[in-house]
A protein has these predicted regions:
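Short hydrophobic alpha-helical membrane-anchoring segments
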Residues: 8-12, 47, 133-141
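Hydrophobic mid-bilayer segments of alpha-helices in multi-pass membrane transport proteins
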Residues: 1-5
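Juxtamembrane and boundary regions of transmembrane helices in multi-pass small-molecule transporters
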Residues: 82, 86-144
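Membrane-interfacial helix-loop connectors
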Residues: 9-110
Length: 144
């Protein structure tokens, strides 16, 4: 229930409108470029905020744009799903799994700073996002 309260407050504070405007700019870049920009932007945002509220917020924004053709919209949904989930792996605060990992490391007295975590996680997160980018482009070719 808290998630919906956060989204409701963000909607009434016009935060969703501002983010929606920025997402619209990304989408306007074109079918392929815009989708990839959406993937990488949602990954970037997800690395510094929890991915579940981010996904819910972006879903609401994408759903509010009825003018997008269905095959392009499918690519956008995949971009948001992959970006918000995989981007959370970049930092120790981006997803529940990384928070758990950091907690376990602290419990076993394994020293790892925030920057150290990012340095070790970045290559894996970037590789995952590159694979997701290729996957989305292949799906886009199939849908078109």
């Amino acid at each position: 229930a808290t998630l919906f309260v956060v989204i409701y407050v963000m909607e009434h504070a016009e935060v969703l409108a501002k983010i929606g405007f920025l997402v619209g700019k990304l989408i306007a870049m074109g079918e392929k470029s815009g989708t990839l920009a959406l993937l990488w932007a949602s990954a970037g945002f997800s690395s510094v905020t929890d991915n579940i509220p981010l996904s819910a917020m972006l879903a609401k924004i994408l759903d509010a744009n009825p003018d997008v053709p269905s095959n392009y919209k499918a690519m956008q949904w995949w971009a948001v799903v992959f970006g918000s989930n995989l981007g959370g792996n970049l930092t120790p605060i981006g997803s529940a799994s990384t928070v758990v990992a950091v907690t376990i490391m602290a419990k076993h007295k394994v020293p790892l700073s925030f920057v150290g975590f990012v340095k070790r996680a970045a290559p894996f997160a970037v590789l995952q996002l590159l694979i997701a980018s290729v996957y989305i482009m292949i799906v886009g070719l199939i849908l078109n």
